[in-house]
Amino acid sequence: MKFETSTRRAVVFMLASILAGSLAVRAYAADKDKKDKTKPAPNKTIDSGAFGIFIKGQRVATETFHIEQQEGATVIKSQLKEASGGDSSQKSDMEISATSELLRYEWSQSSGGSLSVFPENEFLKEKISAPGAAKPTEQAFLMPAASPVLDNNFFVHREVLAWKYLAIAPCKDENGQRRCEPADFGVLVPQDRSSMPVRMTLVGKEKVTIRGAERELLRLNLHGDGFDWALWLDDHDQFKLIKIAIPADNTEVVRD
């Protein structure tokens, strides 16, 4: 798939932003700190909004999310609520370092139960607190801290993975353009207490109908054991995730 070099640069810049900036930016900030040590760097919103989750055309839930670049890290917060208006909800809170390594991940639900994931001795460990349990249980994963987290139902995690793929996918220059190959990732699914391999592939530009209006978006495919998803990003608006299609489940996720 051809991927224009200018587009590639934009994606790399986007990933640099979400990972708290390049070394040059940090060096500049350090020099500036010498002049004004008491002034902290302002937080920067990378993306925020909501995704509507539809099954067979009917809205069943809404995910609201916020991605913020803070000093030395990026925080990704999300909340999932049922469309029926009930009190049931889930929350996730993830923090990654400037080198794309997981610092912490936390999940909880209103009905009780929570979990956390954190690095320990160069690998990842998960701590699970089940409703009514006397004490939490722990599970170790022989995965590096740079492993992406793709937890159930939080689609903003797929947006972050798409940004990472577009920035690091194996590519080669051809006549001023880049042809990108698929990339494989080992990801962690905390709610399932499991890990799995996934592959992301750049398909290219497609015309997609979003709420009755036709838009040209950048399509990527996400494939894993037993699932195939299509993702569409707006390469004219910071590569924001606009839509996900999960045909096997009659499910669509659309940005509000």
For the regions a protein language model found, what residue spans apply to each?
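Bacterial N-terminal signal peptides
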Residues: 13-22
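Sec/Tat signal peptide C-region and signal peptidase I cleavage site
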Residues: 24-28
